[in-house]
Amino acid sequence: MTAKRPLRIVGRRRVARRADGREVRRYVPNAGLSVPVVSILDRYGEVLEDEQRAVVRWAVQGGHGANIIFAAGTTGEWNRLDNRRRQQIARVVVDECHRINAAGVAVEAWVGITGDTRAETLENLEYALDLNAEAVVVTPLSIRDSNDPVDFVNREINALFERSKRSIPVFLYDNAEISAPGHAPHLHTRDVKQMSRMDYVRGVKVTAGKAVLGNYTRAASHFNRGGDFAIYAGDPYLIFDLFAPPKGAGGWTRHYWNRYWTRDSLPYGIVAGPSNAMPREWQRALRVCRNGDAALMHRYAQVLEDFRAACEFNRGGRSFRPTLACLKAALAEMGVCRSEALAPGTPAFSDGERREFARRFRDLRRRAAATLEPGWLSEAEAERPQPRRAVKDG
C-alpha cells in the first residue's frame, strides 16, 4: 500500500481513420488526476515563464502527481487575463509537458481555450492544435457572444476542424460561477447529449455539488454512443463521500443515496484545484478512494480538508476563502516559485492573513508527514527533466 510506482493512466490515441476528409483518432480519456495549474505572474501581470515551468514540474511530481496538467483554466485565472497571456501560458505549459514526457514520465497537457468571444475561443483552439496539446477544454456558457452552446460546439468548432483537416479531443466545462451575464448557470443535459454526438467531444468537467454531478452521471449512458464520455468532478472533495464504503446505518444510508444520485456511476476522474499545493497527496487520495480503503481514505481526507480549512478566514463575521492567493502562497512557501502576484480582480489576502496562512500551512505539512504514508508527501523536484538518450551497443 506504500508503493510509489507512478500511476500511468494516460489518454491514448488509437489507429487513425478518415471522416469527412479529416483525420480523426480514437481517444480514450485519462482517468487520473487533473491539476488545473495556477498562472504565475509578475506584479505587472506578465507571465513568468521559468516559474510557470517549475509549477508544472512540481504538479507532476516525477510521475507521482498529476496525470493531466490543465492550463488556462479558472484556477489559472483565464477570465482575468487577456488572450495574449492565455496563449502564452498554454504554450509554456504544453512545452514543459512535452519535455517531461520526453524524459519518460507520462503526463497530458490540456489547454483551456475559452475566450471572451467566439472569435477568441476559436483562435485559441487553433493555437492549441498548433501546440500539439492532448486536449482542450471549453466553457460554452462563459463565451459572451455565444447564445447557443450546441451551435458553437457542433457547428463552429466542427467547421474549424474541417478547414484545418485536424481535430483534437474537446472537453466541456460547466461552472455556474463563471457563466457570462444572461446565460444559464449550468449546461442542460439535453444540450450536452447533443454535443456529445460529435466525435471530438469526449467529456465534461462539472464544478458543482453532488446533485448537479448526479444529473450528468445519470444521463451519461445516453451520451456519445460512439465511444467513451468522461465526467470529471470539479469538486475533488466529493470523492471522499462518493467512494466511501458503507459502514453502519448512516454509512449505508449515504451509500444508497449516492447510488441514487449517480445511478451507480462514479466520476471518471477529478480536476483538483487544491492539488496545486499538494499534488502527490491528491494522487494517492484518488487511488485509495478507488480501492475503497476506508482507513486510508480517512487519513487523506483529514489532511486535505485541513488545507481547505487553512484557506478560510473571518472578515467582518463572515467566512472568506482567498483560494488562489493561498495556492500561490503555498507554492512560494515550498520554494516552487517566488511570485505570488494575482491577476487584477482575484481575491487577495488582507493584512495579517498571509502570515497566518504560512503558519497554518507549515503546521499542516508537519501533520501530513506524521499522518500519511511514506513517499506520499509532495516534494520539489531538483532539476528539469532531461530527455532519455539512446545507449549505443558495445
Spell out what each predicted region is:
Residues K4-R25, P29, S34-I40, G62-H64, ...:
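C-terminal alpha-helical cap/extension of soluble enzyme domains
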Residues R13, T114, L131, N215-Y232, ...:
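A short, hydrophobic/aromatic-rich structural module that often spans a beta strand
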Residues V47, E51-V55, R85, I89, ...:
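General structural feature for long, well-ordered alpha-helical segments within catalytic domains
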Residues A159-F320:
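Catalytic alpha/beta core domains of metabolic enzymes, predominantly
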